[in-house]
């Protein structure tokens, strides 16, 4: 004869069960409902144990985003406060390359630009001033994204170093564009209008709103936002850069065109870095999603430079400008590891030389490819020894 067991569920146990995962179970499913706990016996069946186990596992996983945990770039990194040892050498090299390219707005000579500015046609002055207004505002938007999102999300030290330096360079770009506006535009009201381009110019506002939406989008993945801001720096800037290089081809505005060389080189590096970060992602957005983001950016940039602020104002062909923007988008798609979308050729031969190393005499002016002495060199390259053979 079996002895009577004491109940497994005491009053304390029943109070504990108020917090148990079982409270979340619906009793409508009779097949999976465990026996009543108020009886003198509890059947320790596999089904009952599995219900407790599965619920506990779900509860422990709830606070963690699997996509973040699966991404080495975004995963919590307790060693992020120390630079060495370097783990991502390719990312670190990009940082050192950016560091070697440092420059300041004071190094650009604008003394000859005033005479050229006054000789320009009204349409040309209108175009240049509006492009500068867009640039002055857009660098601030890029920085907003770096400060508010990317620098906080990315846990890899080498990447955080790059983002920190990029923030400094974007500040210098914004200062340079503001200085150009301040130098060329003498009317205080017009100057104020240009400095507030995001609010005063619908064509600039449209581009700014597109970028700002990505900063505030809490649903978009880091990968999608990296593509979006690669499009901002690679596509939204491309047509405007080309239009200023067109002025250089005509021998106009040496200060403006030289600063454009420096800034376009920096933005090219920032875009390359975005592509590098994209390649390091484990879970990348699908190609169709990337194509959607890129084509949206292309459409907005084409509208900006062929309708809202047409490049024909400075004598450029709007159709060729559309093609050039598509060419730049295709190049970005290849950098991201995908197929071309538009499959067009570069219509501007003068833009082919932008990536080539300049041969400018350093003592005449700093070349656009300038890098700070010794930054990219190995320590052994600058050492002095007495062991040479004579």
Curated annotation (Swiss-Prot):
It catalyses: a 2'-deoxyribonucleoside 5'-diphosphate + [thioredoxin]-disulfide + H2O = a ribonucleoside 5'-diphosphate + [thioredoxin]-dithiol. One of its GO terms (biological process) is 2'-deoxyribonucleotide biosynthetic process. It is an enzyme of class 1 (oxidoreductase). Keywords: Cytoplasm, Deoxyribonucleotide synthesis, Iron, Metal-binding, Nucleus, Oxidoreductase, Phosphoprotein, Ubl conjugation. One of its GO terms (cellular component) is nucleoplasm. The modification Phosphoserine is found at residue 20. It holds the Pfam family Ribonuc_red_sm. Fe cation 1 binds at residues 139, 170, 173, 267. The keyword Oxidoreductase applies. Fe cation 2 binds at residues 170, 233, 267, 270. GO terms for molecular function: ferric iron binding; identical protein binding; protein homodimerization activity; ribonucleoside-diphosphate reductase activity, thioredoxin disulfide as acceptor. It is found in: Cytoplasm; Nucleus. The keyword DNA-binding does not apply. Phosphorylation on Ser-20 relieves the inhibitory effect on Wnt signaling. Phosphorylated on Thr-33 by CDK1 and CDK2; predominantly in G2 and M phase. Heterodimer of a large and a small subunit. Interacts (via Cy motif and when phosphorylated at Thr-33) with CCNF; the interaction occurs exclusively in G2 and early M. This is Ribonucleoside-diphosphate reductase subunit M2. The gene is Rrm2.
């Amino acid at each position: 004869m079996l002895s009577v067991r004491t109940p497994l569920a005491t009053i304390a146990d029943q109070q504990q069960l108020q917090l148990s995962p079982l409270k979340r179970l619906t009793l409508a499913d009779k097949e999976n409902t465990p026996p009543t706990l108020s009886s003198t016996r509890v059947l320790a069946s596999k089904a009952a144990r599995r219900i407790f186990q599965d619920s506990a596992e779900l509860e422990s996983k709830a606070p963690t985003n699997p996509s973040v945990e699966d991404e080495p770039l975004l995963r919590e990194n307790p060693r992020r406060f120390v630079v060495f040892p370097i783990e991502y050498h390719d990312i670190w090299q990009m940082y050192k390359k950016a560091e070697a390219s440092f420059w300041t707005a004071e190094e650009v000579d604008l003394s000859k630009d005033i005479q050229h500015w006054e000789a320009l046609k009204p349409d040309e002055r209108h175009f240049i001033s509006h492009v500068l207004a867009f640039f002055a505002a857009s660098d601030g938007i890029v920085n907003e994204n770096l400060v508010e999102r990317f620098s906080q999300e990315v846990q890899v030290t080498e990447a955080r170093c790059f983002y920190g330096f990029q923030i400094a360079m974007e500040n210098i770009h914004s200062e340079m564009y503001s200085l150009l506006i301040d130098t060329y535009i003498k009317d205080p009201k017009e100057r104020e209008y240009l400095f507030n381009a995001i609010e005063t110019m619908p064509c600039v506002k449209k581009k700014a709103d597109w970028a700002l939406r990505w900063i505030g989008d809490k649903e978009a993945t880091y990968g999608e936002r990296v593509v979006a801001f690669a499009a901002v720096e690679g596509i939204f800037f491309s047509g405007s850069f080309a239009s200023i290089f067109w002025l250089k081809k005509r021998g106009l505005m040496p200060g403006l065109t030289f600063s454009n060389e420096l800034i376009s080189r920096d933005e090219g590096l920032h875009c390359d870095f975005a592509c590098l970060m994209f390649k390091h992602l484990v879970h990348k957005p699908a190609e169709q999603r990337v194509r959607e983001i890129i084509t949206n950016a292309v459409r907005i940039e084409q509208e900006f430079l062929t309708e809202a602020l047409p490049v024909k104002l400075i004598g450029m062909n709007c159709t060729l400008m559309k093609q050039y923007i598509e060419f730049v988008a295709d190049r970005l798609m290849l950098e991201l590891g995908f197929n071309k979308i538009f499959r067009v050729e570069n219509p501007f031969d003068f833009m082919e030389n932008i990536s080539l190393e300049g041969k400018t005499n350093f003592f005449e002016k700093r070349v656009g490819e300038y890098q700070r002495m010794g930054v990219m060199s190995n320590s052994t390259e600058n050492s002095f020894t007495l062991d040479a053979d004579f």
